[in-house]
């Protein structure tokens, strides 16, 4: 068997030098990166562990405070919602009751009209029955008449439309006459009573 001759040409020599330079540059870059990582590690370990614990506790306390505030806000919203729902249920039907009040007024006017003959008296009895049933239905749902005649004037439930001088029968700030009845829905004024007040 013949031996192969190993001769180096100038091109081979130049390629070898280029490979060597590239390896050297890569090695230097790796050393620089390692050195930078070591510096960062030294800086990280240079931070005081006690300070880290203090910082973390402060962050934890801040998060706990945020959580407590959020929970308190949720509880407040739930309570507010319950109160609003209770008020809605309590005053349910307020609009309907207000709309029915003029009907009551008209029935009262019809009852105040004198009935001369028997047909009118029969009609009046029918109106009385309707009026009574309507009042019972309203009372059943918490609608009551405002106390007025002879009572002390209360601007929350009375509306003064006229004043008269004070006399022995009517002391100052008392209701002398009711011109239109007022009504309450539970503890809320549906319509104030229109009254004449002694002053």
UniProtKB/Swiss-Prot annotation:
<dbReference type="GO" id="GO:0005737">
    <property type="term" value="C:cytoplasm"/>
</dbReference>
<dbReference type="InterPro" id="IPR013805">
    <property type="entry name" value="GrpE_coiled_coil"/>
</dbReference>
<dbReference type="GO" id="GO:0042803">
    <property type="term" value="F:protein homodimerization activity"/>
</dbReference>
<dbReference type="InterPro" id="IPR009012">
    <property type="entry name" value="GrpE_head"/>
</dbReference>
<keyword id="KW-0346">Stress response</keyword>
<feature type="compositionally biased region" description="Low complexity">
    <location>
        <begin position="11"/>
        <end position="46"/>
    </location>
</feature>
<protein>
    <recommendedName>
        <fullName>Protein GrpE</fullName>
    </recommendedName>
</protein>
<comment type="function">
    <text>Participates actively in the response to hyperosmotic and heat shock by preventing the aggregation of stress-denatured proteins, in association with DnaK and GrpE. It is the nucleotide exchange factor for DnaK and may function as a thermosensor. Unfolded proteins bind initially to DnaJ; upon interaction with the DnaJ-bound protein, DnaK hydrolyzes its bound ATP, resulting in the formation of a stable complex. GrpE releases ADP from DnaK; ATP binding to DnaK triggers the release of the substrate protein, thus completing the reaction cycle.</text>
</comment>
<dbReference type="GO" id="GO:0051087">
    <property type="term" value="F:protein-folding chaperone binding"/>
</dbReference>
<dbReference type="InterPro" id="IPR000740">
    <property type="entry name" value="GrpE"/>
</dbReference>
<dbReference type="GO" id="GO:0006457">
    <property type="term" value="P:protein folding"/>
</dbReference>
<keyword id="KW-0143">Chaperone</keyword>
<feature type="region of interest" description="Disordered">
    <location>
        <begin position="1"/>
        <end position="50"/>
    </location>
</feature>
<dbReference type="GO" id="GO:0051082">
    <property type="term" value="F:unfolded protein binding"/>
</dbReference>
<comment type="similarity">
    <text>Belongs to the GrpE family.</text>
</comment>
<dbReference type="Pfam" id="PF01025">
    <property type="entry name" value="GrpE"/>
</dbReference>
<comment type="subunit">
    <text>Homodimer.</text>
</comment>
<dbReference type="GO" id="GO:0000774">
    <property type="term" value="F:adenyl-nucleotide exchange factor activity"/>
</dbReference>
<keyword id="KW-0963">Cytoplasm</keyword>
């Amino acid at each position: 068997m013949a031996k192969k001759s190993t001769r180096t040409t100038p091109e081979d020599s130049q390629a070898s030098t280029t490979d060597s330079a590239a390896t050297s540059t890569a090695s230097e870059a790796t050393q620089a990166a390692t050195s930078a990582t070591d510096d960062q590690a030294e800086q990280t370990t240079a931070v005081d562990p006690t300070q880290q614990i203090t910082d973390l506790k402060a962050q934890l306390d801040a998060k706990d405070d945020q959580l407590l505030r959020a929970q308190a806000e949720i509880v407040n919203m739930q309570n507010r919602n319950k109160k609003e729902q209770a008020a809605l249920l309590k005053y349910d039907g307020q609009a309907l009751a207000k709309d029915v009040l003029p009907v009551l007024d008209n029935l009262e006017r019809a009852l105040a009209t004198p009935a001369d003959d028997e047909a009118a008296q029969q009609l009046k009895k029918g109106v009385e029955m309707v009026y009574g049933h309507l009042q019972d239905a309203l009372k059943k749902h918490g609608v009551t008449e405002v106390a007025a005649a002879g009572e002390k004037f209360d601007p929350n439930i009375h509306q003064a439309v006229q004043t008269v001088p004070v006399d022995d029968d009517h002391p100052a700030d008392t209701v002398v006459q009711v011109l239109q009845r007022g009504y309450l829905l539970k503890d809320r004024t549906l319509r104030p009573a229109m009254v004449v007040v002694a002053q």
